[in-house]
């Protein structure tokens, strides 16, 4: 009898334990996110934490499993996930270029049915809702905005210190090199250790000027070649920039993250980067500190590279759809995971996040059309970058947005070789054409 009672007690304890364990089970839907985050950028960490924690609060049935990476580390991890067929549920992606393999392999879900169902298409700039602008040929992601990949920052304080004015053309720029050098300044800063930087932020603009606005279309249609004189001349101009000392060869060894600090420290008169980089200079809401204080930001002018001799056009920059968010095609249709993954994409590109991202410097030209810019507290450099579109007349292609990686990576490497005087422009052009012919 005692044994029976003991057994019943043990059984009761086990049943209670099972109930308690069941009650403690986390039944939330886990959304795995691969997020692109430069932790050192002002507001970046705090803003990301706010966006994702707010989403979880508003959607108690969801748990966000977020992995934060930046630059090449991000792209390497994304390729690893794709190769292993173990995609994140939601990810930060490019409309082409460095995410081309995700588009080509159809690893991203078509968002068109969700966009149409929720009636949000008219809340975005029409270009960002055009599927032909994405390499997949369908709405594989929702872009945060429009990106100008070439911006030319001018430090008036440095120029004034040596009695110079902003250069209007390349000849004036070359003439400034010895004056600036004698005073301990570099002329143009561009952190080019990551090979995409020179291609995206400088050479795409240069190629457009030498070859004309539609040059990439003619090459892809095989009506023009990379070995044609105009493209070779564009490549040779990169060599000339370094040969003339306009850009010091040491810049090839500068990490991308170091560029803003160098410019803010008055190490150079000019700085080349994309429009997004303004976010690195503004005030961090947590610390109250800025790389360049709002008062000193009035000394920074933002436009495009001065006129270059021998080109077909000037007053131009390179423009492309901005980065944005996508869902893995592998998510089962109609599942709770799909439901919440879409809600997260919609939230990250929605009005509330877009307004905060714009005000905090993350998106200079947002894709949303319903934002209240008048209520935003924008610093001088943010206003200047917002007006960048008025500083040039022609928008040309970004190379890694119109050619596959097997071609643009050869260009990327070739630009570094030109900077270091290791190859001629003609030799690089031949290598690029060979890569294109092998497609």
What are these regions (language model features)?
Residues 134-144, 150, 174-223:
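Extracytoplasmic/periplasmic solute-binding protein
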Residues 34-38, 51, 98, 205, ...:
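Extracytoplasmic/periplasmic substrate-binding proteins
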Residues 177-179, 220-251:
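Glycine-centered hinge/linker elements that transmit conformational signals in sensory
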Residues 24, 39, 97, 108-110, ...:
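Mature extracytoplasmic/periplasmic domains
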Residues 80-81, 88-89, 119-157, 186-187, ...:
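A structural signal for short loop-to-beta-strand junctions that line the ligand-binding cleft
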Residues 70, 94-151, 165, 174, ...:
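Hinge/lid segment of periplasmic solute-binding proteins
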Residues 143, 219, 319, 360-371, ...:
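C-terminal capping/gating helix-and-loop segments adjacent to ligand/active sites or protein-protein/ligand interfaces
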Residues 20-105, 117-122, 166, 285, ...:
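Conserved N-terminal structural module of periplasmic/extracytoplasmic solute-binding proteins
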């Amino acid at each position: 009898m005692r044994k029976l009672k003991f057994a019943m007690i043990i059984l009761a304890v086990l049943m209670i334990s099972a109930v308690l364990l069941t009650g403690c089970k986390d039944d939330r839907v886990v959304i795995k996110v691969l997020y692109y985050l430069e932790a050192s950028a002002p507001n970046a960490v705090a803003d990301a934490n706010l966006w994702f924690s707010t989403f979880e609060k508003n959607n108690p049935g969801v748990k966000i499993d977020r992995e934060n990476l930046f630059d090449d580390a991000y792209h390497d991890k994304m390729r690893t996930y794709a190769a292993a067929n173990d995609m994140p549920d939601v990810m930060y992606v490019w409309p082409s270029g460095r995410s081309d393999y995700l588009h080509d392999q159809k690893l991203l879900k078509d968002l068109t049915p969700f966009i149409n169902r929720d009636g949000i298409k008219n809340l975005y700039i029409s270009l960002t809702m055009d599927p032909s602008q994405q390499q997949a040929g369908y709405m594989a992601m929702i872009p945060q905005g429009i990106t100008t990949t070439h911006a030319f920052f001018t430090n008036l304080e440095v120029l004034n210190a040596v009695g110079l004015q902003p250069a209007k053309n390349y000849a004036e720029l070359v003439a400034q090199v010895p004056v600036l050098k004698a005073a301990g300044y570099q002329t143009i800063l561009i952190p080019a250790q990551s090979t995409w930087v020179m291609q995206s932020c400088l050479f795409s603009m240069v190629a457009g000027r030498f070859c004309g606005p539609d040059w990439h279309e003619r090459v892809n249609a095989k009506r023009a070649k990379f070995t044609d004189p105009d493209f070779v001349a564009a490549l040779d101009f990169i060599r000339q920039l370094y040969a003339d000392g306009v850009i010091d060869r040491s810049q090839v060894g500068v990490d991308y993250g170091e560029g803003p600090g160098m410019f803010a420290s008055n190490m150079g008169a000019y700085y080349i980067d994309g429009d997004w980089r303004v976010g690195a200079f503004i005030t961090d809401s947590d610390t109250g500190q800025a790389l360049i204080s709002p008062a000193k930001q009035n000394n920074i002018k933002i436009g495009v590279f001065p006129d270059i001799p021998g080109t077909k056009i000037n007053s131009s920059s390179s423009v492309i759809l901005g980065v944005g968010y996508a869902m893995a095609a592998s998510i089962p249709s109609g599942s709770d995971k799909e439901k919440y993954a879409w809600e997260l994409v919609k939230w990250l590109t929605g009005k509330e996040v877009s307004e905060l991202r714009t005000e905090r410097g993350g998106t200079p030209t947002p894709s949303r059309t319903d934002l209240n810019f008048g209520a935003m507290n924008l610093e001088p450099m943010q206003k200047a970058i917002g007006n960048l579109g008025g500083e040039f007349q022609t928008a040309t292609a970004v190379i890694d947005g119109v050619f596959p990686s097997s071609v643009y990576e050869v260009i990327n490497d070739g630009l570094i070789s030109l900077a270091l005087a290791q190859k001629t422009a003609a030799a690089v052009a031949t290598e690029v054409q060979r890569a294109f012919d092998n497609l």
